[in-house]
Amino acid sequence: MTETLLELINVPRNHVLSTIHNYLTKMTSNYEPIRRLPNMQDAGPSELAQRDNAVTKLRSVFGLRGYDRAETPILEQTELYLRKSGGTLSSRLYGFTEPGGYEVSLRPEFTAAILRQTIDNMTDSNAVRIMYDGPVFRYARPEDEDGLKTRQFTQLGAELIGPSSSDADGEIIAMSLEGLNCLEIADTRVVVGHVGVIAKALEAFDLSERAKLFLIANISELKKGGTNSVLEKAATFGFLPDTAVADLETPDNRTQIEKKIDRVLSDGIIGPFGQNIGPRTVEDIVSRLSKKLSETDDPDNFKKALQMLSAITQINGNANNALQNAKNVLSESGLDPAIISSCADVISSAQVEGVPIEQINIDFGLARGITYYTGMIFDIYSNENNSKSHQTLGGGGRYDGLTRALGYDYDFPSLGFAYNLDALVACQGPDTNSASNTYFVSPENCGSVQAAVSEASELRAAGKRAAVQYKNNGATSSSVQSEGESR
């Protein structure tokens, strides 16, 4: 039919084919190579071999402590991560609407999904020990503080579900350090904080739940010395003077407050201490705020709590000194220094597990972007790694209230931690023992392709890596030998 058509329009066949070829060549030459997405990384054979080796060793360490593997979907309903996750994490989700109509996100972490899976399948009250590993995804804008971090990385971690005692806290801390030891990562330390101590201290000031959660959510800001900025936020949300009600009725002031709330929302700050705002506008929030300001917390108590929290978040150092300094701050604030005992118990339990006290620091200003932690929290470092990049190798904590946040009608004691596996591998440095031991069998040396295939098969049957080295653009034997042994 093609020939008939060409005859009808009286155009030489070769001319038509040449024109089509030239057009296609021109069209395809305009294509740009498709590059990786920003802050996404490829992993080649040597990197994967080193990562797999680390995973195998860590699974062995965890397995010897009774932990079993579990997997969860990479894709989950977005609501799983929004509930009690805090503004920081929710603003970093890779979320979209899937064809079935569900709002879904690539997982940014494992904990919530592992807990959901465990609770749904639990048959008795015994402790459940789970380990996991896999990719997680967290978006960061280039202008953000961590905007240059890889947006996909591998987490490997463990969850201990059931025990509520500080003994379990000690187990998790000790195991996190054992993992680093098995990878021969030297000069490691653990930095421990305690959200539970902070929460218990705040109870003494007779504050509303909103006020306490607000203060806890701003620990990181207070640690940096940002007391004034926290006071400004507090005034915006009605935690300070009663005159705020009148201020809201003044058009100019109302406009300014709306702008502040809009900025706070865009920064992802409201999530940790408020309910999900859903489709409500800034105007809706301001209107609701004006109705609630008459129920505001006592400003003097709020300021005293803020002063205490500002002081205790500055405490950071070796465990014994930090505990004593925290007791002093509590006493000076008119609080019972025994409040600190729950943190001291965690340190003692870690020592029972074999962690030297010299390896433990306490930082009461340690904060988390994921706000479901309710007790001890910790980060783990290699001192050498920390001095270069100021990034943790991993961390975790206790999150006894997460089950209720996920929609269950009870709290369930749970704790865990996760490594950034890519950071662990980077901390190890290049693997000098990962050179290929593949035998490349040359058909020229064997006399024929069939003979080379047969010899390669015999080598593989003996448990050796072997491949036939076919000719490829005139590759020389010397280039082959650089990759492995040539036969």
Q: Can you describe what each PLM-predicted range is?
A:
Residues 2-16, 20-112, 151, 165, ...:
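TRNA-binding/sensing appendages of the translation machinery
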Residues 92-101, 206-236, 382-386:
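Acidic, His- and aromatic-enriched active-site or binding-groove loops in soluble protein domains
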